[in-house]
Design a protein with these regions (language model features):
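Short, solvent-exposed loop/turn positions at domain surfaces
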Residues: 1, 18-21
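Short, well-structured beta-strand-loop connectors
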Residues: 2-15, 34
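Iron-sulfur-associated redox domains of electron-transfer enzymes in respiratory
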Residues: 21-122
Length: 122
C-alpha cells in the first residue's frame, strides 16, 4: 500500500503481523493520500492509511454472496474469521480467531457470537 494507490471498500489495507493484531480493510473507496503514524487512545502508536474518498461504493447497501461457512472445518472457519479482521469490541479489541482458538480443544455443538459486545443500550 502506497500513496496514490486506489482502494475499494473492503479491500485489505493492513495485514496482521503479530499475535494481538488483526487485518484491516478500507471502509471507503478512494485514493491513499498517505501512510502515517498516529497515536491510539491507549497511548500506543501505529501506522494508519489515510484515504481520500473517491469513486463509487460497490459493496455498501448491496446484498453480497453468502459464505458457505456451514461446510467449513474448524481450521478453515478460524482462517476466514482471521482474514476478515474480526475483533472483540470490549475493553481490549482481541482478535476473535485467537479467542476461538483457545476453546478448540473441546467439541462445540453451538457457537453463539455477541455481535454487540459492550453495547450499553442492549
Amino acid at each position: 500500500m502506497h500513496a496514490g494507490d486506489r482502494v475499494r471498500e473492503g479491500q485489505l489495507v493492513g495485514r496482521a503481523e503479530a499475535g494481538e493484531s488483526a487485518n484491516v480493510h478500507a471502509p471507503i473507496p478512494g485514493i491513499v493520500r498517505e501512510i502515517r503514524s498516529i497515536l491510539l487512545p491507549g497511548g500506543d502508536r501505529t501506522d494508519a492509511v489515510v484515504i481520500d474518498m473517491e469513486g463509487e461504493f460497490d459493496r455498501l447497501g448491496k446484498q453480497l454472496p453468502a459464505h458457505e461457512w456451514q461446510s467449513l472445518d474448524p481450521a478453515a472457519l478460524l482462517r476466514l474469521i482471521r482474514e476478515h479482521g474480526v475483533v472483540g469490541m470490549g475493553g481490549v479489541p482481541t482478535p476473535t480467531h485467537r479467542s476461538l482458538k483457545l476453546s478448540r480443544d473441546g467439541r462445540c455443538e453451538t457457537l453463539v457470537l455477541n455481535g454487540a459486545e459492550s453495547e450499553p443500550y442492549l
